[in-house]
């Protein structure tokens, strides 16, 4: 959950949360071009299907719809999932690429879609998007050779427009010379963007509205999303305190032990094993991501960092 502050995980007044949720989840807005658009097009031209994964509200559905020619949303109604169970082929029929949104609500579709791709022998057939990884199922094929995985995250400053995009990783990799690069953003502006977060729905909202949204998002995670996605009942108070600790320690090599100590300092004792279970649950809904330690050339004698950095 990039760019959110520890304060965003505190509980907002219930009426404010409800009003903000209606405003931000219900509004329609013009599509914002995303960094993954080009890669999604390339993957659709080379694979039978693409699986878009990422946290709720990061823009997966909008991006999928932008590239799809037909779609079905499994979270619209319980009857849609029932239809998928009774007649899976009805869900798969439509112009291609066909978007199947929140597919993890009907995980049995995975093997059916995989076989459909094999039968059609065509590329760019399906786009699957989901805000939670389905539980492990030994019967489910990996999808290798049929599906490409595409990870989406909240928007970068370039996507949300505050950045001038004068510097990019591709230009640095190409050894392009960078001269006269200047940004009008102040430290205050950057702090405001960090509080706002990279959610597409918040692009034109005030900082106050953004804080309400982020508080609501965290509250939904602790009260509903995690249990629905993992089947595990978590202590909402401990989970919220862990999330606050993760926000404080984001982009660091924090360990389960250090996080447990940090949470304990807030007055809630919790052991390392429980912390690990909670971290795994947050990873399932893509609210937490571990960045592997950077590895230099194998021939280099430079000492490698071994611990992953956590991003929340």
Region annotations inferred by a language model:
Residues 5-8, 12-41:
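N-terminal pre-Walker A segment at the start of P-loop NTPase domains
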Residues 13-14, 131, 137-252:
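Interdomain motor-coupling "hinge/lid" segment immediately C-terminal to the ATP-binding subdomain
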Residues 24-25, 203, 207-312:
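Accessory nucleic acid-recognition modules appended to NTPase machines
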Residues 52:
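Hydrophobic anchor at the beta1->P-loop junction of P-loop NTPases
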Residues 60:
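Conserved lysine of the Walker
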Residues 63-64:
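Hydrophobic positions on the alpha1 helix immediately C-terminal to the Walker A/P-loop
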Residues 84-127:
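Conserved nucleotide-sensing/catalytic segment adjacent to the nucleotide-binding pocket
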Residues 119-140, 282:
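Sensor-1/coupling segment of RecA-like P-loop NTPase cores
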